[in-house]
């Protein structure tokens, strides 16, 4: 008996020590090489995706004498979520995504989020237009193409919801031109594949926005990065992985990087560090050791799509058609049948289907999730899991899907589809934010968030959606937070040349909407609609009363996306 108790005690002690090691080891700071540059560079960008490259493009124009270095662990730019095949949310402008316009308890439609995202996408168009005019981006048709956006629903309740959504949105200049119909013949004209083979007794409705676009962020990222390298003050380091971040007493940072070709490590001193590493940003934020990092954790979710490349199909579907999540399913499950242009070809993608993975990057490690767990966030992550049982069940169910199950979902949006028409492709990884709320403790937060240290010397972008589509707007926010002095001393004036609407809300005025859209449509070879003043005065966005959302332990649930 005594021997058994001794063995049990030993096991308990061993388990406790192993648990402590597991929770504290990720934050252990090992010794690293000293910086090999006495004079710090101005900026280090971590990650070769759309965010880092967009920020670098801004900085190179605003402060061309600054020395900028970018480190990417893979052997090329834009190989993770910025790549066209890995980026599910292309051309996000809130024209079709129904989760951005939730119906409130009183039956009204909240459109505040949709208007904000639509304005952010207009800023993206301004930014890309500026780069095209200055030769930093190729012919617009190589990265952005007119692709109408549709919302498509069936069932009386959903049809009524879509009607109310349409009525609320078209009062705003940014949504002028959106059409609504319950006529199957009209909807079939918009999107033949949605309607052919559908039973005649099924009531359907759709909205159609002719100003929608499809965007290839891989092309944008690679071409902007190519232009950045034209400057002697910019250096790109591929096959280099950041392994440590240490702040010096003078508030500069030593960034330790490993050359993956030879295994050698070195450190570089920098005045400012931006972590734009997609899903890996959380782990790098934790490596920095800044107090703000203790308030965050992450939850990875992968995505898969059915890909159609047969021209007999792709030439008959030139829209992005978004549906509505099934009853009881999380908003991230919103299905869409997307017309895309990838690798110079027309493609149609249907999905997403969630993919369980513990990786934070498509080319990451299966240990990514576990190595991000520490004594600061472990209990909170368990609490978030308990408060999101429906989401956990959904992901578990998705993990068991067969090809027959996926095809059954496809038939709801493409009734005449055949299993031989498609192949299953895996997209990029998304890491949803788990953060500490002062009132609720750890919560699951959707959308993106900039995390910055109190000295404004290190910034990280966490989260996923809408992500790339609003990258110029997100990086504008970062510039304002990280470099307030420079903004006051000349940057704001220069930014108005890059973003003519800077400091204004495009949706506030039909005249401003027309001015900006006319300019970007001409530069980007996109369709344009003149907004008449009398019919498109901006509506006061409906804002949900705070108590309507008080029962949830999540934040920004309408921003869920794969």
From Swiss-Prot:
Signal sequence residues: none
GO biological processes: tricarboxylic acid cycle
Its EC number(s): 1.1.5.4
Start and end residues of each stretch annotated as Disordered: 535-562
Gene3D superfamilies (alphabetical): D-Amino Acid Oxidase, subunit A, domain 2 (3.30.9.10), FAD/NAD(P)-binding domain (3.50.50.60)
Biased composition (Polar residues): 545-562
Catalytic function, reaction form: (S)-malate + a quinone = a quinol + oxaloacetate
Record family assignment: Belongs to the MQO family.
PANTHER family per UniProt: L-2-HYDROXYGLUTARATE DEHYDROGENASE, MITOCHONDRIAL (PTHR43104:SF2)
Entry protein name: Probable malate:quinone oxidoreductase
Organism: Xylella fastidiosa (strain Temecula1 / ATCC 700964)
Organism lineage string: Bacteria, Pseudomonadati, Pseudomonadota, Gammaproteobacteria, Lysobacterales
Encoding gene, per UniProt annotation: mqo
């Amino acid at each position: 008996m005594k021997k058994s108790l001794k063995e049990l005690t030993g096991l308990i002690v061993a388990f406790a020590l192993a648990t402590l090691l597991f929770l504290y080891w990720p934050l252990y700071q090992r010794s690293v090489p000293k910086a090999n540059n006495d004079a710090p560079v101005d900026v280090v960008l971590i990650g070769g995706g759309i965010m880092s490259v967009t920020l670098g493009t801004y900085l190179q124009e605003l402060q061309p004498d600054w020395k900028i270095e970018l480190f990417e662990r893979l052997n090329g730019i834009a190989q993770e979520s910025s790549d066209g095949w890995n980026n599910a949310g292309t051309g996000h402008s809130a024209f079709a995504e129904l989760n951005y316009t939730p119906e409130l308890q009183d039956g009204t439609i909240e459109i505040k989020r949709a208007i904000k995202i639509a304005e952010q996408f207009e800023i993206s168009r301004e930014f890309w237009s500026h780069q095209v005019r200055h030769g930093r981006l190729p012919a617009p048709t190589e990265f952005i193409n007119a692709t109408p956006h549709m919302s498509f629903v069936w069932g009386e309740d959903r049809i009524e919801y879509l009607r109310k959504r349409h009525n609320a949105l078209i009062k705003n200049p940014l949504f002028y031109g959106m059409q609504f119909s319950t006529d199957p013949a009209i909807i079939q004209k918009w999107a033949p594949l949605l309607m052919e083979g559908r039973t005649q007794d099924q009531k359907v409705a759709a909205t159609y926005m002719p100003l929608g676009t499809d965007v290839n962020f891989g092309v944008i990222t690679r071409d902007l990065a190519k232009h950045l390298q034209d400057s002697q003050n910019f250096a790109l380091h591929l096959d280099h992985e950041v392994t440590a971040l240490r702040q010096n007493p003078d508030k500069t940072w030593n960034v330790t990087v490993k050359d993956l070709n030879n295994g050698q490590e070195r450190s570089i001193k920098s005045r400012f560090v931006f972590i734009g590493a997609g899903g890996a940003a959380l782990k790098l934020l934790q490596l920095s050791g800044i107090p703000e990092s203790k308030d965050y954790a992450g939850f990875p979710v992968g995505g898969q799509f059915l890909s159609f490349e047969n021209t007999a199909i792709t030439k008959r579907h030139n829209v992005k058609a978004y549906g509505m999540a099934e009853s009881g399913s999380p908003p991230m499950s919103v299905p869409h049948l997307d017309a895309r242009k990838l690798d110079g070809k027309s493609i149609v993608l249907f999905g997403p289907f969630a993919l369980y993975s513990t990786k934070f990057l498509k080319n990451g490690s299966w240990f990514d999730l576990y190595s991000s767990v520490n004594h600061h966030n472990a209990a909170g992550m368990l609490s978030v899991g308990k408060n999101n049982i429906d989401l956990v069940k959904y992901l578990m169910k998705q993990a068991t899907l067969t090809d027959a199950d996926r095809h059954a979902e496809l038939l709801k949006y493409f009734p005449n589809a055949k299993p031989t028409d498609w192949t299953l492709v895996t997209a990029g990884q998304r890491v949803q934010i788990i953060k500490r709320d002062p009132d609720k403790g750890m919560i699951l937060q959707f959308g993106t968030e900039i995390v910055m240290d109190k000295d404004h010397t290190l910034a990280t972008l966490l989260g996923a959606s809408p992500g790339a589509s609003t990258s110029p707007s997100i990086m504008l926010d970062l510039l304002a937070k990280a470099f307030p002095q420079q903004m006051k001393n000349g940057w704001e004036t220069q930014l108005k040349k890059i973003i003519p609407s800077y400091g204004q809300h495009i949706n506030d005025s039909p005249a401003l909407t027309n001015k900006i859209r006319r300019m970007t449509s001409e530069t980007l070879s996109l369709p344009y609609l003149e907004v008449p003043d009398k019919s498109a005065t901006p509506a006061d966005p409906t804002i949900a009363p705070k108590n309507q959302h008080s029962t949830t332990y999540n934040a920004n649930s309408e921003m869920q996306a794969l």
